[in-house]
């Protein structure tokens, strides 16, 4: 499964344990792109709403992401967690390390684009200042994380200790591994952004193998 060789230390390599973020080991070289917002807000969207088959979002999710059956997060072959981000963060398939002020690093991959009308500065959402929106299966996630208002984690993953904290740095991940400097050619090419701008998601057909 995806956790094998993905930078996570986890007793159960078949599923993603959020607590493993505390011991996450970065595998790829990265370059800081600065912080456009330090917001701690971390909202979510359900991936099953993307329906445009021709969009880069749909194609990337369909071909490179797997729904974790424990937490409902979507993860790619590198173990990066699927999120929606603004236009400042490039094309679909671009990977980042999100460093929090708690010392935790969250590896994310842009699988959907925040609509420009909803994030006019290209970074944070106008209505809640969130920089990242986790792309999840909300049914699985609700069963795992819970919530008191009908929303997963009451609508904000910052309510979860493992994800709590303000953004301290955002680093663009390269194809070059830290330990050996060899290009990891098996990683998927970044896809071109489509005209689809809705913050929405669609079912996954792909999967990982050991």
Label every PLM stretch briefly.
Residues 16-210:
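Solvent-exposed, well-ordered loop and adjacent helix/strand elements within mature globular domains
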């Amino acid at each position: 499964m995806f956790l094998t060789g993905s930078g996570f230390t986890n007793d159960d390599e078949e599923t993603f344990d959020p607590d493993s973020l505390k011991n996450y080991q970065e595998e790829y070289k990265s370059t800081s792109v600065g912080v456009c917002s330090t917001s701690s807000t971390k909202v979510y969207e359900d991936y099953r709403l993307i329906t445009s088959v021709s969009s880069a979002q749909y194609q990337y999710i369909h071909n490179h992401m797997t729904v974790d059956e424990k937490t409902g997060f979507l993860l790619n072959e590198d173990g990066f967690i699927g999120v929606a981000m603004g236009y400042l963060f490039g094309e679909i398939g671009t990977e980042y390390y999100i460093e929090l002020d708690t010392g935790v690093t969250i590896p994310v991959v842009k699988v959907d684009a925040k609509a420009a009308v909803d994030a006019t500065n290209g970074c944070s959402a106008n209505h809640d200042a969130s920089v990242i929106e986790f792309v999840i299966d909300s049914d699985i996630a609700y069963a795992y994380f819970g919530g008191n208002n009908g929303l997963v984690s009451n609508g904000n993953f910052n309510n979860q200790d493992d994800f709590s904290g303000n953004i301290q740095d955002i680093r663009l991940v390269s194809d070059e591994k830290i330990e050996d400097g060899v290009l990891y050619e098996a990683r998927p090419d970044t896809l071109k952004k489509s005209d689809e701008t809705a913050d929405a998601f669609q079912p996954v057909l792909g999967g990982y193998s050991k």
